[in-house]
Every structure is written in C-alpha cells, then in structure tokens.
Amino acid sequence: MWAWALLPICLTIWATAGIWIVYGMSVSNGSVNLTDGFPFISLCGTYPPQSCVFGQVLNVGAMLGVWISVIRFQQIRDYGCHSVLNSVSLAMGLLCALGTSIVGNFQQSNQLETHLAGAFLAFVIGNIYFWMQTVLTYMVKPKHGGCYIGPIRFCLSVACTALIVLMAVFLKLNMKSISAICEWIVAMILFLLYGLFSVDFWHLDGHYFHVKKRTAIPNEVEVSTVTLNI
C-alpha cells in the first residue's frame, strides 16, 4: 500500500519544519543572540515558549521513528533476511528514538547530563543505525530504488559520521558556532535518511503479518485465521 511511503516523508517534514520553527521562535524572542554565534539546536529549544514546541516536535518524531524502525525490521524479515544485524539494527533504531525523546524533555539548562545522554543516542546511535541499514540494503533482495538507494545511504552515512567527528572537534576547540552548524547539518541528514525509507515502504503492499500459535508438537506451527494486511 503506497500510503506507507508517506510515513517516513511525514517524519522528515515534521522534524525539519519543527526544529526550524523552534529556531525562528528563539531568535525572534531574543532567547538566542545570533551576534554571539550560531546556536546549537538544544539551545534554541531550552527556554519557553519554544521549549514546549521543541518537546512536542521531538516526542512526535520519536514515535514516528519507532514506528518506522519496527516496520523496516519486519519488512527485511519478510524478505527472508533473518540476520542478527537486522535485530541489532532495530535495537539501534529504538534507542535513537528514545534519545530523541529524552533531548526534547530534558532541557540542557535543567538536566545537562541526561540531555547529553539523549543527544548521544539520537546522533551517534542514530548514525550507527543508518550504517546498519546501508549494509542491509545490499543484503536484502529485492533491492528497491534500483542501484541508487544503496550509494545514497552510504554517502549520507559517511557525511553524517564525518560531521559528528567535526562537531566534537570544534566543540573541544571552543569553536562553538562552527560546531553548532555541524550539528544542524547532521540533524538534516538524519531526517533525510529517515525520509529515504519511503522508497522501501512504497513496496509494502502484499506483505503480511501472521499471528501464529505454537502447537504441542515441536517444529509444527498452526497459523491462525487472523491475518493483518499492511
């Protein structure tokens, strides 16, 4: 069903528009001063009223991220790929979503350590998740998106990794403005990587989740009459 392809697109649009709206609010009400340098995303969402919008944007984004991660995991399994990598990838996707929610609910001005832990899950673990998805793209058949989707995911994952390293280096050198720019670009890349799942989800029509019940005899499975068409 082609409608599933809208889910990753909705996440990309929602998250991208949301954090830039938060940025606009923080600049317009003077919560951040651009003359001091370009602000980090978290700084823009620290103070009210934009902190309320920031939390809501990231909470909804986290929910959509969980939904997408689970569907992608099941899609890969339905294609006959039962690799451990797929299971680990699901765990990474869920941790990324958890970190995103933590960032939105624990502002750096109140709970800095918790906020940084959430940022690590959202950015670093999120980057690892998409590296795993890049590998799975080459493992799974059929390959949706032709010969382009794999290289695109690879290039975006490389760029994301490089920018995370640069963000940490510039922050260590006290070049906060440049570090913040790197952070914003990383966020945009991660949103784009989520949006690319629309290529895979476009082909979800015809796949089924079967509710199965174990029988008393090992290795025999009785399939129930309940079939969920996605």
Swiss-Prot record:
GO cellular component, one term: autophagosome membrane
A single BP term in Gene Ontology: autophagy
One Pfam family per UniProt: Frag1
Cytoplasmic side: 1, 72-83, 137-150, 205-230
Homology family: Belongs to the DRAM/TMEM150 family.
General function of this protein: Modulator of macroautophagy that causes accumulation of autophagosomes under basal conditions and enhances autophagic flux. Represses cell death and promotes long-term clonogenic survival of cells grown in the absence of glucose in a macroautophagy-independent manner. May have some role in extracellular matrix engulfment or growth factor receptor recycling, both of which can modulate cell survival.
Protein name: Modulator of macroautophagy TMEM150B
Species name: Xenopus tropicalis (Western clawed frog)
